Swiss-Prot record:
Coiled-coil regions, chain positions: none
Enzyme Commission code(s) on record: 2.7.1.170
Phylogenetic classification of the source organism: Bacteria, Pseudomonadati, Pseudomonadota, Betaproteobacteria, Burkholderiales
InterPro entries, sorted: Anhydro_N_Ac-Mur_kinase, ATPase_NBD
Protein name: Anhydro-N-acetylmuramic acid kinase
GO biological process, one term: amino sugar metabolic process
SUPFAM superfamilies xref list: Actin-like ATPase domain (SSF53067)
Superkingdom of origin organism: Bacteria
CDD domains linked to this entry: ASKHA_NBD_ANMK (cd24050)
Record keywords, A-Z: ATP-binding, Carbohydrate metabolism, Kinase, Nucleotide-binding, Transferase
Binding site for ATP: G12, T13, S14, L15, D16, G17, V18, D19
GO molecular-function terms, A-Z: ATP binding; kinase activity; phosphotransferase activity, alcohol group as acceptor
Pfam families: AnmK
Keyword Nucleotide-binding: yes
Length: 375
């Protein structure tokens, strides 16, 4: 392609803000020219959080939230262009994920649905850049889960010769990519799926009891003691016994779900609950690495959870013999990986290349993902 500059914008289930990258794919390799981030305005964050569960006047509220998110996205895109001295006319496309508020693949009628709030038409108008959005619906239409979509990008970025690699993205929800060695004979399939909660429950508990949006470095969790009974109840959810392909979200793992698990532990010290939630995330992620990726001796961690030192320590404790390392040493800093993935997916859309992996999502085959909204 003549133009190999793409913007990727991602706001994940953590609802902590928008991450954006300006990525250069010249020669088929990725180089990040600029990175920018913006926190959610409090009112928009609260509305997006509320839209995760059924409520009154949802269509009206979702439409206005989409407008607000498009404006926030446009601000991040503008910052990327300013920081890199790049005119909008040089950017081939902007991949904008949107904000997932419902994810119910294959349910109800065999197809189900996934809903990412966004207004890509407004985003194209505000930025003057072609926008690619709605990445997940095409995979659902082909019988897939629509998630996770990052394993294809993880393969492009992290796969290496002679060594299988596991990649753990810890956002609000955690997902795992298991990458065969790049030179493995027979081109074995990539495996990927959502492990379960990542930061979502920890962040909720931190906000509720400390007023902080997250537990910085996991220090609060490290001050508490794990509650074995609560941990067992958290781990007993049927989701964890399901075999891949599988995906999940705040539809399941939300404050109401946590409250039900906490009911027998009324009176527990908040720090002990935080310690237990951190152990919960570490234990379910590590269990999936051991169950499905036991040949991987390198676990690359990205997403906001990679910055939680206590969580990383607990992962290492559960995975003796596995090198657990942040993605920085292997190509991109943790907070840039998902945004870069959606720049890569936008590029794949323009090139009419499949962006999903059927071995990951369970779709009937590879599909070109996303819808294009011309500037």
């Amino acid at each position: 392609m003549a133009g190999e500059l793409f913007i990727g914008l991602m706001s994940g289930t953590s609802l902590d803000g928008v991450d954006g990258v300006l990525a250069d794919f010249a020669d088929g390799r990725i180089a990040v020219r600029a990175y920018a981030t913006a926190p959610f305005p409090a009112a928009l964050r609260a509305e997006l959080m509320a839209l995760n569960t059924p409520g009154d006047n949802e269509l009206h509220r979702a439409a206005l939230a989409g407008n607000g998110l498009a404006r926030l996205y446009a601000g991040v895109a503008s910052q990327l262009l300013a920081d890199s001295s790049t005119p909008a006319s040089q950017v081939a496309a902007l991949g904008a994920h949107g904000q997932t508020v419902r994810h119910r693949p294959t349910e109800f009628d065999g197809v189900g649905y996934t809903l990412q709030i966004n207004n890509p038409s407004l985003l194209a108008e505000l930025t003057g850049i072609d926008v690619v959005a709605d990445f997940r619906s095409r995979d659902l239409a082909a019988g897939g889960q629509g998630a996770p979509l990052v394993p294809a990008f993880h393969r492009a970025l992290f796969a290496r010769a002679g060594q299988p690699v596991a990649v753990l993205n810890i956002g609000g929800i955690s997902n795992l990519s298991l990458l065969p060695a790049a030179d493995a004979p027979g081109e074995p399939a990539v495996l990927g799926f959502d492990c379960g909660p990542g930061n979502a429950l920890m962040d909720h508990w931190s906000q509720l009891h400390t007023g902080q949006p997250f537990d910085r470095g996991g220090r609060w969790a490290a001050s508490g003691q794990v509650l074995p009974g609560l941990l067992a109840r958290l781990q007993a959810d049927p989701y964890f016994a399901k075999a891949p392909p599988k995906s999940t979200g705040r539809d399941l793992f939300n404050p109401a779900w946590l409250s039900a698990c906490l009911a027998p532990a009324i009176g527990a010290a908040p720090a002990d609950v935080q310690a237990t939630l951190t152990e919960f995330t570490a234990s379910v992620c590590a269990a999936d690495v051991l169950r499905y990726g036991s040949d991987s001796k390198l676990l690359i961690v990205c997403g906001g959870g990679a910055l939680n030192d206590h969580l990383i320590e607990r992962l290492r404790a559960h995975l003796p013999g596995v090198e657990v390392a942040a993605s920085t040493a292997h190509g991109l800093p943790p907070l840039q990986v998902e945004a870069a993935a959606f720049a890569w997916l936008a590029r794949s859309t323009l090139r009419r290349e499949a962006g999903n992996l059927a071995s990951v999502t369970g779709a009937r085959g590879g599909r070109v993902l996303g819808a294009i909204y011309p500037a």
